[in-house]
Amino acid sequence: MNEPTRRAFIFGTATVAAAGLLLGVQRILSSAFADSDDPASGPVKIAQFAPAGTPTGFATLPKVRKTPAAWKSQLTPVEYEVTRQAGTERAFTGALDKQYAPGLYRCVDCDNALFDSQTKFDSGTGWPSFYQPIAPENVREKTTVYFGTLLREVKCTLCDAHLGHVFPDGPKPTGLRYCMNSAALHFFPHS
């Protein structure tokens, strides 16, 4: 074997081994940090809100479950990719990033109330950002691993739609930034 071919072989083998090791570590971390409180099926307790944003009480409802085909027929391709496949829309492309009118943000998949415009702020990230959900019962967080980085995924409690992620760099009073995908939300102005 001549020297350039031998180097290419060694480099290629090392690259494949490193990639395999990285994927193995990610798989181990994913299972080690997986949330055990992931409710596979309902019922779940959520807070309900009137169109004007006032709380109307709590309801215990069955989880919304549909086949992939049913979700695809209900959602746009981008909504399906974001909410059902945990995708992320490109920064500054979502319709709700600069929406600051008074209103409610509901799940695009199941209409669950998620965020109130009073908690929305301009994070400069290109995604709608809130410092807290409208009710802690209406969203849930799940630890995920993405290329070796631990993230707190935010999901709809009622239908398990992927909404975005939460980060500890938000404003007062919570210090949190719920970084959401516009494609996961419907905005309803207060009536």
Question: Model-flagged regions — what are they?
Answer:
Residues 23-69, 73:
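C-terminal segment of N-terminal export signals and the immediately downstream linker at the start
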Residues 50, 63-66, 72, 82-106, ...:
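A short Gly-Trp-Pro
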Residues 1-20:
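N-terminal secretory signal peptides and thylakoid transit peptides that target proteins
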